Regions:
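Nucleotide-activated chemistry modules centered on ATP-dependent adenylation/adenylyltransferase
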Residues: 1-250
Length: 250
């Protein structure tokens, strides 16, 4: 079976840059697929960002979805009666990991957008997954701020979640987040999503928020508490410049 390269595009800046680097490095030698797992609760602007990236990458994006749950975290919560906890988040497992497993082939070489500051997470991922996988960003010492800058410098407007000063382009109200500052920001930016998660977590008895050593329900969170990080710093360092030159020379 012929090997192919599968770049996992998540509508985040890191996965976009990792995919761009992988395409340049491959230079058409092996079949290459850019795959995206659809999650309904991500920001609608992701469709615009994906279309912009598709033109930048020069490769069509293959959209994948878990039809059983229509790609929705809330349908996962409803059917699984579980949001998150010691066993992780079922939405990640069912809407992303399971979809990836169904799509992948034994001979695939996978490309992921782990950044240089995520070396520990990358090592854990490799330990937990018996697959042929590479991280172009770690190989080049590229951090998340470098990726934000490279996307911006390519002329593509960053996804709305970044422009709203979120650290990553996750769902509007990520169930894996436990910080009061994060959820109070979601309360302001996406009140409907805050209320929906508050209702669902109360229904399932899940205390999402962590304050000190205590857990509290989302609907018990006092407005204004917590401190979420300000706007991400967007600047291109030396490794970023080296990677940009690599792309320009490709």
């Amino acid at each position: 079976m012929e090997q192919r390269i599968v770049c996992w595009f998540s509508c985040g800046a890191a996965s976009a840059v990792a995919t761009k680097l992988a395409i340049a490095e491959n230079a058409g030698r092996l079949p290459l697929v850019v795959a995206r797992c659809i999650v309904r609760e991500e920001h609608d602007d992701n469709e615009r960002f994906a279309a912009d990236c598709e033109r930048w990458l020069g490769v069509p994006i293959t959209n994948l979805i878990n039809a059983k749950y229509d790609g929705s975290i809330y349908k996962v919560f409803h059917k699984e009666s579980y949001i998150s906890g010691v066993y992780g988040a079922p939405c990640t497992r069912l809407l992303k990991k399971e979809v990836r497993h169904k799509f992948e082939k034994m001979t695939d070489r996978h490309v992921f957008g782990y950044c240089a500051e995520e070396q520990g997470r990358w090592d854990n991922f490799l330990d937990a997954n018996n697959i042929n996988a590479v991280s172009p960003l770690i190989e080049r010492g590229l951090e998340h701020s470098d990726c934000l800058a490279m996307v911006r410098d390519s002329g593509i407007e960053l996804p709305m979640m970044y422009l709203l000063n979120y650290k990553h382009n996750n769902c509007r109200g990520c169930c894996k987040a436990t910080g009061p500052g994060y959820w109070n920001k979601v309360r302001v930016d996406f009140p409907d999503y805050f209320s929906r998660m508050a209702n669902e977590s109360r229904r399932l008895g899940v205390k999402i928020i962590r304050i000190g050593g205590d857990r509290v329900f989302l609907d018990e969170l006092e407005p204004g508490t917590g401190n979420y990080q300000d706007e991400p710093e967007i600047q291109c360092g030396i490794f970023c410049e080296m990677a940009k030159h690599e792309l320009e020379a490709a």
